[in-house]
Amino acid sequence: MSELTKEHFATNVYYDRTFDRDAAKILPGEYYYTGKDMLIVTVLGSCVSACIRDRVTGVGGMNHFMLPDGGGDADSPISASARYGTYAMEILINDLLKAGARRENLEAKVFGGGNVLSGFSSINVGERNAQFVRNFLKVENIRIVAEDLNDVHPRKVYYFPRNGKVLVKKLRQLNNNTLVNREQDYANRLQSGSVSGDVELFS
């Protein structure tokens, strides 16, 4: 794993008593993958997560990202915004392939893109993120087998890569501002920092 990859790989692994297994919690800008019978969990507002797995081997993972605002047309593959989204997707897919997944067996479930953050662009941030992840997977010929995108509610997503099961809990009321603060901090970091290095997919 390169230094660049390590910077984005989630390190918050704990034992989840509810589901009786190890779990990895991913934050905005992070991703996690595993071949073990684990749980990967995240909370999404405007960000999106792609849960991608090899349906034969059960090797799978999840990312959590948003497109930076102001990078031009998110649909243009050369915009800074699209390059960041592409990086977030490719770093996960590359690590899955390195871990033994086969490209032709990959399937995806995508979540998030809620209308939670405002003030970052004229178009809804969540909608842009949802549109990007759908388009990326279509271009890469990775089938989306389930999705829960857009809406106005944040979501807590529990992903079991070994069998592909996903549980989604809509958070109709937030008890605090942690999620919104986390996403706004992440959006600000994206604005001030440069897009991470290029990653190429291999098959």
UniProtKB/Swiss-Prot annotation:
InterPro entries tied to this protein: CheD-like_sf (IPR038592), Chemorcpt_Glu_NH3ase_CheD (IPR005659), Cytotoxic_necrot_fac-like_cat (IPR011324)
Keyword Nuclease attributed: no
Catalysis: reaction(s): L-glutaminyl-[protein] + H2O = L-glutamyl-[protein] + NH4(+)
Matches recorded under Pfam families: CheD (PF03975)
Official protein name in the record: Probable chemoreceptor glutamine deamidase CheD
Organism: Janthinobacterium sp. (strain Marseille)
Family that this chain belongs to: Belongs to the CheD family.
GO MF, one annotated term: protein-glutamine glutaminase activity
Protein keywords: Chemotaxis, Hydrolase
Enzyme class name: hydrolase
Function: Probably deamidates glutamine residues to glutamate on methyl-accepting chemotaxis receptors (MCPs), playing an important role in chemotaxis.
GO biological process: chemotaxis
Keyword Membrane: no
The enzyme's E.C. designation: 3.5.1.44
Family matches, as HAMAP family: CheD (MF_01440)
